[in-house]
Amino acid sequence: MSDLFTTIETPVIKYEQPLGLFINNEFVKGVEGKTFQVINPSNEKVITSVHEATEKDVDVAVAAARAAFEGPWRQVTPSERGILINKLADLMERDIDTLAAIESLDNGKAFTMAKVDLANSIGCLRYYAGWADKIHGQTIDTNPETLTYTRHEPVGVCGQIIPWNFPLLMWSWKIGPAVAAGNTVVLKTAEQTPLSALYAAKLIKEAGFPAGVINVISGFGRTAGAAISSHMDIDKVAFTGSTLVGRTILQAAAKSNLKKVTLELGGKSPNIVFDDADIDNAISWANFGIFFNHGQCCCAGSRILVQEGIYDKFVARFKERAQKNKVGNPFEQDTFQGPQVSQLQFDRIMEYINHGKKAGATVATGGDRHGNEGYFIQPTVFTDVTSDMKIAQEEIFGPVVTIQKFKDEAEAIKIGNSTDYGLAAAVHTKNVNTAIRVSNALKAGTVWINNYNMISYQAPFGGFKQSGLGRELGSYALENYTQIKTVHYRLGDALFA
């Protein structure tokens, strides 16, 4: 094998892993010859090393994307774009076990959950394949002697920076609408989880995309990510990640060429349970809402607010439910929670847990690492929490949840809106009027009623306040990747007097 590919064996499958930067439909080494290690979070061992993109590599990838956008990609019809995206989805479906195994390997998510992610990733691509030939403008009746119409044109070269918590799902969320709308892409993977996106990159060429349309590079935010954000020949940047980094990207975009920006950022989402809620249903969804994907979800229901009438009963039963979540080897069939993605993330979460203990909150269950190897953390439930505590205000991004008591609807809304974030929220109640009133009052981009974490690629997703700018998914995402041109065609012969 060359240093651009290696053979990796997982408990599920043995496969050939690309290691290079995918630029112009080829895997290549980085200009500076740098590589970095990819760690298995389940055992803390090195899986392999991949080539690292630096600023120079971003320049090469952007040049390839620009050449494709100005050249062959312009000649591909919208219907043909849709066919290509569908072909890519077909290839991902063919290799779904391989892709899911890769995500379990370098991300640590349960293999069964990874397959669900892949199904949604494939579905998302097919959804946008269907949109490719349905993007259109309108005619506007301004006066009898003028034909006025609008065109929705592609933005151009799009820089896309995806996170490590849902590598291929975010890959599809980004490239689906961008490519459907006729743009070209330079996508940077997270340095913790580059492997599945690199494998999927080889499917891009197999699907028949022209060279340069989709370029996939691996690298670090401080170098490759910064270069994308400030690049003068990138027309739009999309980022999913922390609010802190989102601010940096927005500043870089403004200081460079004022490129369009979409940001899907952090959250501290309230999951509100009223006295009249179906408590079994609420506990089930609240458990899924926080501990799914090891708590590494931007929209995780990390603050459970319970009305005082059922608070004690809820806490006791929720604690029991959390203790039933199996933490362990992501390749075992019944594993629900795998390891956190990295040592850095593990340490950060443990720091928050220790801070909560010192602040006076009570650990109802968990509060420590799980096992002696890997970045595993016990599902952790804090009670006796006040809204001013750090663990109730800041995004922890791990399997840690706070439970607070509220008296009435007004207090629930007040506590629910008491952070800087506004990505998501949930309301559990049997009263339709309560559900509608509270969902309307919550400052959140998505509100679930009597469920949690049910995101659909057909519906928009994004945040209020410091949880982001713009919307992913649904037809709304296409607005991020098109720009509107108005054309006034003079039909009459009269000269301007």
UniProtKB/Swiss-Prot annotation:
Q: Where are the transmembrane segments?
A: none
* Highest taxon of source: Eukaryota
Q: Where is the signal peptide?
A: none
Give the E.C. number(s): 1.2.1.3
Q: Which residues form a coiled coil?
A: none
Q: Where is the active site?
A: 264, 298
Keywords attached to this Swiss-Prot or TrEMBL record, sorted alphabetically, are: NAD, Oxidoreductase
Q: Which GO terms describe its molecular function?
A: aldehyde dehydrogenase (NAD+) activity; aldehyde dehydrogenase [NAD(P)+] activity
| Binding-site residues for NAD(+), renumbered to this chain | 241-246
Similarity comment: Belongs to the aldehyde dehydrogenase family.
UniProt cross-references to PANTHER family, sorted A to Z: ALDEHYDE DEHYDROGENASE-RELATED (PTHR11699)
Protein name according to UniProt: Aldehyde dehydrogenase
Organism in which the protein naturally occurs? Emericella nidulans (strain FGSC A4 / ATCC 38163 / CBS 112.46 / NRRL 194 / M139) (Aspergillus nidulans)
Please spell out the taxonomic lineage of the organism that makes this protein: Eukaryota, Fungi, Dikarya, Ascomycota, Pezizomycotina
Q: Which gene encodes it?
A: aldA
